[in-house]
Amino acid sequence: MIGASPNATRPSYFVFSYLRTRGRYDVSPINPTTAAIDGVKSYPSLAAYAAERGVPDIVDVFRRPDQLMPIVEEAIAIGAPAIWFQYGVINEEAIKRADEAGLDVVVDRCIKVESARFDGGLAVGGLNTQLITSRRRQASRTPGGGLR
């Protein structure tokens, strides 16, 4: 997971922790600014990860859109089969490059949400709306002016 943070208030930490607790995912942080997150070794780059552990099945990305092209190039260089850009991580040039290189590309989706949906976890929380989006819904107002 590129951009995984040791800060428990960051979305990348929440997703990292969730996937680890599922028991069937082997998630490693890629973050050059930290040695480990929750006792899991962090790698400074995808290349460093691949040299030690092999090619990951999915490269999950929590970085700003302007930082995606070098990440895509590194994913291509190590032979990654898939790249997943989290909610709001959209860079059309990087997406096109990854797609043209033959990677499976997932854009504007959260791997935690999709995992929970796949496992039936959204239904347990009453959240199985079948609508997955990064856009906030506008609150509707009642005729009296209150929020619904």
Regions found by a protein language model. Give the residues of each.
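NAD(P)-binding Rossmann-fold cofactor-contacting core
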Residues: 5-10, 17-38
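Short acidic/polar active-site loop segments enriched in Thr and Asp
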Residues: 25, 57, 81-82
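Glycine-rich, highly charged phosphate/nucleotide-binding loops
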Residues: 37-69
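Short acidic, glycine/proline-enriched helix-loop-strand junctions
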Residues: 53-54, 92-115
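ADP-ribose/adenylate-binding Rossmann-like module
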Residues: 75-98
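A charged, well-structured terminal subsegment
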Residues: 114-148
